[in-house]
Every structure is written in structure tokens, then in C-alpha cells.
Amino acid sequence: MKLTMGVHVLLYSSDADADRAFLAKVLDLKSVDVGGGWLIFGLPPAEMAVHPTDAGAPPASGPGMIGAHVYLMCDDVQATIAALAKKGVECGPVHTERWGLRTALPLPSGSALGLYQPTHPTALGMV
């Protein structure tokens, strides 16, 4: 069993409509409409790097960079939590949201990644 099936990135924006148009028209990203004007964009394969933080450094550097929440996606959150528990990882409680089931996946540093089982259409495989 794969522990994750993809990555879901949330970008916060003061002008979501403009950013959605940019993603669609400028970056040519395909999307799935999950209702209410919410678009989820397909992304190419991803990679992740771990960067150390310096005391007092902002969480993101560069003009306009305000950070992001990263969620690893899975097909079955309970089965994934059980598989992680066998590896010594204790996830937080599962919360039911209108968009899926979510929990926190703790990292050794004390930070955490989101882990969720989507209940909405996904944009995976649209690239």
C-alpha cells in the first residue's frame, strides 16, 4: 500500500479569481471544478526539500511569499494512519471537513504536514 497518493497545496490569495485565471491561462494548468467557484488545479509530479530555519527568519522569503499549507493525499486516511503507526508515527485526531477527512502528520522537527483523504473530485492525473 502506498502511504500517499499525491500532494494538495493550498495557496492563500488576496485576489483568488486573478490567481486562478493566471494558473489556468498563463501556466496552462487544467482544473477540476469542485463547486462554488472552487477550482483545483492539476500539477506535474512534485518534489519536496527540507530547509533549515534560522532564528528570526520569516517562514518564507521573497516578495509576496506568505507561505503555504502542504497536505499529502491518501486513498484511505484510517488505513494510512494505521500503516504510519506501525512505523512509529502517531498522527493527530481525524477531523471531518466538507472536503475530506484530515489529520496532522507530525515531523521530527515539531512541525507537521497535513494528511487527508479527499471526498471531492481531484485534479490528480490531469497533467
Where are these regions (language model features)?
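Residues that act as N-cap/strand-start positions at coil-to-secondary-structure junctions
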Residues: K25, G35, I66, E97-W99
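Conserved short beta-strand elements that form part of the metal-binding/catalytic scaffold
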Residues: L29-M65, P106, A112-T119
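Short beta->alpha connector loops
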Residues: A55, D76, T96-R98
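Short secondary-structure junctions
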Residues: L27-D33, V89-V94
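Vicinal oxygen chelate
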Residues: M1-K2, M5-S14, L39-G42, P59-V127
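N-terminal beta-strand motif that seeds the catalytic metal site of vicinal oxygen chelate
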Residues: M1-R20, E47, A68-V70, T119-V127
